[in-house]
Amino acid sequence: VLALGTASRTILTKEERCRVLEEMGGDVLLECPLTEKIRHMKAENFIKEILIGDLQVSYVAVGEDFRFGYERKGTPAMLKEFGKKYGFHTEVLPKEMDGRRKISSTFVREELNRGNMEKFRFLMGTDFSVEGIVEHGRGMGHKYLLPTTNLIPPVEKLMPPNGVYITVSHFRDRSYQGITNVGHKPTVGGEKFIGEEPVSYT
């Protein structure tokens, strides 16, 4: 059972993003905290102080619609211009398309909110997954010889709509096929679990 928080909204959690980048071959991940100074820093100053001054970059890769700096005035063209002056190369990556529509986080969220898991897999290049903390329940599953696992996902994780899904669960070095119910526990009167709407897989 997965207990869903109302603040769920990110496609990938911070930990998931880090793992994806590592699997893609990244050696080092540096995060820039969004302080008041950074929030109000002009794009030109961000390039000079952070990219050139602190990181001493030689190569920058951004998407074609990438924006940065105060009021989002920094553009890929600006990066290219400064790169010529300060000696770093900027590569601008085109958007991936699905027909005539650009693949974006908004597009992915729409399909996940619809429960279109096949489309989600196509857009993301991988199946939907969630990690969480196992929570002990009432033992109702064991009573009826159908044990379940109660799982609480990260509160910021965007989850699919209520429903029943075919799933694969991974624990330690083993995988288990199962059925996951996202929503209220159907066998216990539909009450909420630890104050949140649960999900269950058996």
How would you describe each model-predicted region?
Residues 2, 134, 151:
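Short clusters of hydrophobic/aromatic residues that line enzyme substrate/ligand-binding pockets
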Residues 10, 35, 97, 109, ...:
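Generic anion/oxyanion-binding catalytic loop in active/binding sites
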Residues 14-19, 53-57, 85-87, 115-118, ...:
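Glycine-rich loops and low-complexity Gly/Arg-rich segments
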Residues 137-201:
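Phosphate/ribose-recognition catalytic cores of enzymes acting on nucleotide-derived substrates
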Residues 33, 64, 182-184:
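Short secondary-structure boundary segments
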Residues 40-147, 162, 170:
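Classical nucleotidyltransferase
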